[in-house]
Amino acid sequence: MLKKQVFYGILLICAFVCIYGEDEDEKEAQDEYQPPTVLVALLVRNKAHILPMFLSYLEQQDYPKDRIAFWLRCDHSSDDSIDLLKQWLKHSGDLYHSVNYAFDSDGPHGYQNESSPYDWTVSRFKHVIALKEEAFTYARDIWADFVFFLDADVLLTSQQALRTLTALRLPIVAPMLLSESLYSNFWCGMTEEYYYQRTDEYKEIYHVKKQGSFPVPMVHTAVLVDMNHKGARNLTFDRQRLRDIQQSNQQLDQPLYEGPADDIIVFAMSANSSGIPLHVCNELTFGYILQPLEPGDTLEQDLQMLLNIRASMVSDLGAVPPVLEYFQPLIKTPEKTKLTLDHIFMINLERRPERRQKMENLFEEIGLQVEHFPAVDGKELNADRVQEMGIRFLPGYEDPYHHRAMTMGEIGCFLSHYRIWVRMVQLELKEVLILEDDIRFDPYFRANAVRVLNQARSVVEYDLIYFGRKRLKEESEPWVADADSLVHAGYSYWTLGYVLSLQGALKLLAAKPLEKLIPVDEFLPVMFDRHPNKTWTAAFKKRDLIALSAAPLLLYPIHYTGESGYISDTEDSQQINVQTTEGVARLKSDREQVFVKKGDDGILEQQLKMGESLSNVLPGKTHQEL
């Protein structure tokens, strides 16, 4: 038996050495060769607003510049696109193997029968197709290993994008790009009439439910072609050339292409006719893409999409990657606003400075004027400190999911929100947005938030409006009359972001919640009388908070439970050692934490006392008086 164990042990060691040795040998062999040459083919029209980012991120690619050549064309532009391209070439053109460019600043700004710069007329299709065919010919002439067809709407934020794509050695591959919506640069389905077809696989790839490189019927906008593949000579964007190629391959018994003279569809069908697979790769977060505009759209809509993309970069990457120094003066952020509210607070833990910085980056990109509010840190609380504050817990409370008592993190979270309610009353702030520091904003947040607020003010009195939450799916939530973006809120988790009125703050303080404490996201549904636990609700006699919710929601958590990067300071903190009728209490898995600032103990006690005294004025107040 022992001899067998020794034998198998030696066998495993030998196998490991062989595999590891092969990997090392392969790596050494690869290091002996130059990276493949890449021709970047770029067509530009009216892209001055995005070119500084596009060119900066392209230049920042971790790929030898002497192995990259450019083929650039810019025409029919009425903005500063040509000037920006010339500026970039002046600074960086000599870094690359070669640059072939042609800029037409004297020609017409529009195409025949064009209704707007975003209209794709027949003449525009013909012109673009001819240019792409020219780029293909040039790539063959200079013996490029790859040609990378790029639109200027592509922002390759991953510096490993080009190196990763070329290493795949696929005949045709596109990096999967993110947008403000579900739009991307690939299709997973195509109808017999060459239209886009919805599939379940599309979302799986887009949301990276599965990771890798996947065969698809269509890629566009950012497409890398291996020019050394035998079938590459048959790839084309031209409809007539595709038909000619198909006719010359009659032995394949293929019907001639009868579809539209659309460059991306023709390219996909030419690959299909030649038996060349198209792939999309989502192994990296390669970057972002702007959605194409329709003929009736405006430049302002493109700028708004770019703002949304920059906000997504902050949420995904922590900050917008910087542009080249000489382009920095061209990067503008919107003027900051309070969304027609009196104030906006963001609750943040002092020991989470990275979250604060990320949120401040986000506010800068979106244009929000927000005050940082130091959170009460559960790690600085203990049972003695809690008792000194006069805090008592609701008898019988236990967390609905984990069946445990409250944690110090949850206590700190409640006190943080409570302090803002007190501040509102002190300063007589009529409407306030309260944000936590682990959120991402939905696209067009500013405009949608103002619309929701105006609807609420015009059609109904309110105390609280959820901007972000997790609703109980079974709960019925009727629409607010005469409003298309508001519902009457049902039982909800999380306090990611909500608008609170002064009247609402007074109602919450009047309930004296520190005398029967429960987590803040359980307390709020109790106060608008939609909590399913009637034992808890019975402890709060007056439950007349008027609570609404934006529909759809306007903000979401950055991470959900179980996802990479998810941290909960409320759930992972120490539990209280206080007896309740049911013994234990618990935490919600998807709620984030809040914390306490050193040196604020005295201020906190004063505010707690003031909150209790202020709550006594509530019965004499009406909505009209406030």
Curated annotation (Swiss-Prot):
Gene3D superfamilies: Spore Coat Polysaccharide Biosynthesis Protein SpsA, Chain A. Its main location: endoplasmic reticulum. InterPro entries: Collagen_mod_GT25, Glyco_trans_25, Nucleotide-diphossugar_trans. Disulfide bonds: none annotated. It is found in: Endoplasmic reticulum lumen. The keyword Signal applies. Keywords: Endoplasmic reticulum, Glycoprotein, Glycosyltransferase, Signal, Transferase. Belongs to the glycosyltransferase 25 family. A motif (Prevents secretion from ER) lies at residues 623-626. GO terms for cellular component: endoplasmic reticulum lumen. Pfam families: Glyco_transf_25. Its EC number is 2.-.-.-. SUPFAM superfamilies: Nucleotide-diphospho-sugar transferases (SSF53448). GO terms for molecular function: procollagen galactosyltransferase activity. It is an enzyme of class 2 (transferase). This is Glycosyltransferase 25 family member. Residues 1-21 form the signal peptide. The lineage of its organism: Eukaryota, Metazoa, Ecdysozoa, Arthropoda, Hexapoda. Glycans are attached at residues 113, 234, 272, 533.
